[in-house]
């Protein structure tokens, strides 16, 4: 899994050299942000159910047809609503994984690779998840560096979906 630290090491190793001052500064920067990232991951995990439920409501409010259209891709039934919440939870979980490792590797490897195919196969609209993640970003309650760290991965996911 790629992280800023593993990328620096892989680059230096492939060239048979020690880490440069710039690479060491990059690694040090990651360690300085690690506490804030872990605090953000912990807070998002602890508040996950509430954030997911509220984010799903934000999707239903912005896209009311999602609760009116019959079919497996929509939230017109309890099963459909549960699937929507499950999918939002998956995105949020990926954000917490990225916070823990300090890079987009988990999202790139477990989510981005097959995202377009999954959405097309199941007739899912990326705009639903953009709305859900935007809601989470605006309502996670994090402050300072923890918010900055979480928002960077939420933004990454939003951009991938856009």
UniProtKB/Swiss-Prot annotation:
Membrane-protein topology: Peripheral membrane protein
GO cellular component: chloroplast thylakoid membrane; phycobilisome
Subcellular localization: Plastid, Chloroplast thylakoid membrane
Protein keywords: Antenna complex, Bile pigment, Chloroplast, Chromophore, Electron transport, Membrane, Photosynthesis, Phycobilisome, Plastid, Thylakoid, Transport
Pfam families for the chain: Phycobilisome (PF00502)
Gene Ontology biological process terms in this record: photosynthesis
PTM comment: Contains one covalently linked phycocyanobilin chromophore.
Residue positions binding (2R,3E)-phycocyanobilin: 84
Database matches in InterPro entries: Globin-like_sf, Phycobilisome_asu/bsu, Phycobilisome_asu/bsu_sf, Phycocyanin_a
Task of the protein: Light-harvesting photosynthetic bile pigment-protein from the phycobiliprotein complex (phycobilisome, PBS). Phycocyanin is the major phycobiliprotein in the PBS rod.
Subunit details: Heterodimer of an alpha and a beta subunit, which further assembles into trimers and the trimers into hexamers. The basic functional unit of phycobiliproteins is a ring-shaped hexamer formed from two back-to-back trimers contacting via the alpha chain subunits. The trimers are composed of alpha/beta subunit heterodimers arranged around a three-fold axis of symmetry. The phycoerythrins also contain a gamma subunit which is located in the center of the hexamer.
Family: Belongs to the phycobiliprotein family.
Protein name, as recorded: C-phycocyanin alpha chain
Organism (species): Rhodella violacea (Red alga)
Organism lineage: Eukaryota, Rhodophyta, Rhodellophyceae, Rhodellales, Rhodellaceae
């Amino acid at each position: 899994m790629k992280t800023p630290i593993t990328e620096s090491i892989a680059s230096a190793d492939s060239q048979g050299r020690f880490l440069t001052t710039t690479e060491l500064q990059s690694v040090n920067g990651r360690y300085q942000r690690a506490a804030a990232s872990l605090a953000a991951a912990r807070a998002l995990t602890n508040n996950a159910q509430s954030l997911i439920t509220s984010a799903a409501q934000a999707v239903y409010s912005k896209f009311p047809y999602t609760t009116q259209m019959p079919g497996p891709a929509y939230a017109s039934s309890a099963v459909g609503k549960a699937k929507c919440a499950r999918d939002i939870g998956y995105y949020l979980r990926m954000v917490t994984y990225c916070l823990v490792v300090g890079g987009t590797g988990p999202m790139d490897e477990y989510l981005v690779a097959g995202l377009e195919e999954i959405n097309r196969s199941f007739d899912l609209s990326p705009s639903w998840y953009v709305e859900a993640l935007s809601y989470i970003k605006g309502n996670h309650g994090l402050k300072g560096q923890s918010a900055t760290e979480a928002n960077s991965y939420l933004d990454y996911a939003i951009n991938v979906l856009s």
